[in-house]
Amino acid sequence: KVLYLDCDVIVNGSLCELWNTDISDYAVAGVRDRINDYIRVYNRLGYPMSEGYINSGMMLINLKKWREDDFFKKAQQLACEKGASVLKNHDQDIINAIYHEQILMLPFRYNLLEYYLYVEEWLYLDRKYYPEIIDACNNPAIIHFCMPQKPWHYECINPFKELYYKYRKMTPWPEVVLTHKMQKLSRKQKIKGLLGKLGLYHIESKPTLRREVNVIEELNNVLF
């Protein structure tokens, strides 16, 4: 097996327990992505939502299984068959589509996606995951800077960005100048951004969703 990590992560704790996880009966182990409960994802990829959807930024991979399955060939075939319009998340979609029945879900702390640091993002997940996400935020083993604003950008507001500065000082490039990430938006990008905000009005107009927001605001007080 092999532990795969994206380049925009910081290891913040021991990975021994993670490495010792038995995945002999699975093709891959990973952490649920924030779009785990998006029905559209499963409609697009063609498998049941009950099987879940992982983020590919941290994966414990069963190499024996992948080799036996000739995964690379399957991935090529799927990419050619479905195309970018279906496989919007590229390799992540491909891995989930091929191995959705053979995924072991791991605790959120092993891939703390930056989205989970902002409780409004929790609206996209089932409430049953909230306690585990709180634990992950307080005790992350792997911190994933998965949003467009990385720690080396001025716009980054991730509370863990100081860890990046800490470790950067230990590298041969301790004085790298930060850069601005935000670029001038096109008209299309502005329209997409405005459309995204319509979801807030939808929440306000639905009592059930409004209650969910209130719960999240209470959790925010506990966390931060």
Model-identified regions with their sequence ranges:
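GT-A fold catalytic core of metal-dependent nucleotide-sugar glycosyltransferases
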Residues: K1-Y38, L60-I61
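A short, conserved beta-to-alpha structural element at the edge of catalytic cores
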Residues: V28-P48, I157-F160, P172-W173
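Short, P/G- and charge-enriched loop/turn segments at secondary-structure junctions
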Residues: N43-M49, R127-E132
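Short glycine- and hydrophobic/aromatic-rich loop-to-beta-strand nucleating segment
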Residues: G57-W66
